[in-house]
């Protein structure tokens, strides 16, 4: 796991002895957004539910890997070196992505270690949102719009 300091300075842990001086430096060894990440976040909505099922061999992904909690997603992205997912634009525009409006059986009747049914339904949102997706989306958008350093992120990602 990475410390908060290492997350702030990802190049701090790069082994410089293996760097090719002719190679342009980069932060991400894999892409931060791809169809699998998008369907991961949007799996409660069609056509992304169908795409997710197709990606995972005619079933939804394992419940332990599904997007079910903003807190868990934040913890994973903040601590795992190889988790480079970014929030997709829909986080700022589509509150329905956090609700299981299609009543999908996302856990596919799987059982936990105690034999209890695993239930994955709506995404667990932070307490400040009062578990209302519209509150969550509006607050994310407000924070994005007031961020004075968004241009640095754009430069980092797109050059």
Name each model feature, range by range.
Residues 1-159:
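Long, non-catalytic protein-protein interaction scaffolds
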């Amino acid at each position: 796991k990475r410390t908060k300091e290492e997350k702030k300075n990802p190049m701090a842990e790069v082994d410089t002895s293996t760097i090719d001086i002719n190679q342009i430096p980069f932060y991400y060894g894999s892409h931060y957004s791809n169809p699998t990440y998008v369907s991961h976040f949007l799996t409660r909505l069609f056509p992304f539910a169908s795409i997710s099922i197709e990606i995972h061999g005619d079933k939804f992904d394992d419940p332990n890997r599904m997007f079910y909690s903003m807190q868990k997603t934040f913890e994973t992205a903040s601590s795992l070196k190889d988790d480079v997912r970014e929030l997709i634009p829909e986080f700022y525009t589509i509150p329905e992505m956090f609700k299981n409006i299609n009543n999908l059986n996302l856990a596919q009747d799987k059982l936990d270690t105690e034999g209890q049914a695993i239930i994955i339904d709506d995404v667990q949102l932070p307490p400040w949102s009062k578990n209302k997706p519209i509150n969550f989306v509006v607050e994310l958008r407000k924070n994005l719009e007031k961020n004075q350093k968004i241009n640095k992120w754009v430069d980092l990602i797109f050059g």
